[in-house]
């Protein structure tokens, strides 16, 4: 799982948060915790083994929710080793139109392009 240190415990409350051991093995995963144990945010970037992917059927057969990939991760890390990869540099949450517009305008400024007033992919 790719993670990013958001650097702020209040901001961490908005995300799925992971805790890791000294080898970056995931020891805990909590979705939008009231009191985050760390500032390592799950970025919804996952790499699964074939064995992990095969566990999806078991996960669903147990009546777990089929949406939100974080639910599967929270379940899986207690059954199989999962590790965190810490993204260096910048990461942008583009979960809604306003966040996407902000990230897009930041990139546009870097390239000397005019900012957009609203997001339109064209």
Located regions from the model:
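Short beta-strand-to-loop element that shapes/binds the nucleotide-sugar donor at the catalytic cleft/hinge
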Residues: 1-17
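Catalytic-core segments of class I nucleotidyltransferases/pyrophosphorylases
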Residues: 10, 22-121
């Amino acid at each position: 799982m790719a993670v990013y240190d958001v650097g702020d415990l209040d901001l961490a409350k908005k995300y799925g948060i992971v805790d890791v051991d000294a080898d970056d093995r995931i020891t805990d995963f909590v979705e939008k915790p009231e009191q985050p144990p760390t500032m390592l945010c799950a970025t919804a970037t996952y790499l699964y083994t074939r064995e992990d992917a095969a566990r999806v059927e078991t996960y669903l057969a147990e009546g777990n929710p089929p949406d939100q990939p974080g639910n599967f991760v929270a379940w899986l890390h207690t059954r199989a080793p999962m590790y965190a990869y810490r993204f260096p540099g910048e990461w942008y949450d583009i979960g809604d139109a306003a966040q996407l517009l902000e990230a897009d305008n930041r990139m546009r400024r870097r390239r000397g392009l005019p900012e957009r007033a609203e997001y339109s992919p064209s």
